[in-house]
């Protein structure tokens, strides 16, 4: 609910050279995944005008504005093939949530990468690329 506040999250996240966001990336990823140069690049991106608010607005909208489609309606179904790649050690998207997401897909597939976290594309890019190539083939 913290992100629902109008300006305080932006203020706090910018403090101390983005220390909280840097800590989140480092503490929720495998060691060494986000190097100091990577984090400097992230800080530059976060600092661009409107970028941080845009990041937070996704969470704000997801919690405040219910979807115009009921989750059990035909309009809410994903009819195209869908692939969800999840790290087994993801601290943000639980395994149950990932599996339940497939119930909204006519042709959904879940790939669990044993040693990855939420940042699966950063931690195991070759494996993610292989899975995507196979999926789109």
Show where each model-derived region lies.
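Flexible "cap/lid" subdomain of the alpha/beta-hydrolase fold that forms the substrate-access gate
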Residues: 1-112, 133-134
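Catalytic active-site module of serine/aspartate enzymes centered on a nucleophile-bearing elbow/loop
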Residues: 107-137
């Amino acid at each position: 609910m913290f992100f629902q506040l109008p300006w305080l999250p932006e203020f706090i996240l910018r403090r101390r050279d983005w220390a909280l966001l840097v800590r989140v990336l480092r503490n929720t990823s495998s060691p060494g995944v986000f190097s100091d140069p990577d984090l400097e690049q992230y800080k530059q991106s976060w600092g661009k005008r409107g970028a941080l608010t845009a990041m937070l607005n996704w969470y704000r909208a997801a919690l405040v504005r219910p979807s115009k489609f009921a989750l059990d309606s035909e309009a809410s179904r994903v009819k195209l093939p869908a692939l969800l790649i999840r790290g087994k050690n993801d601290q943000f998207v639980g395994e149950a949530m990932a599996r339940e997401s497939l119930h909204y897909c006519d042709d959904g597939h879940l790939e669990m990468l044993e040693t990855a976290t939420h940042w699966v594309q950063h931690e195991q890019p070759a494996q993610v690329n292989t899975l995507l190539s196979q999926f789109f083939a």
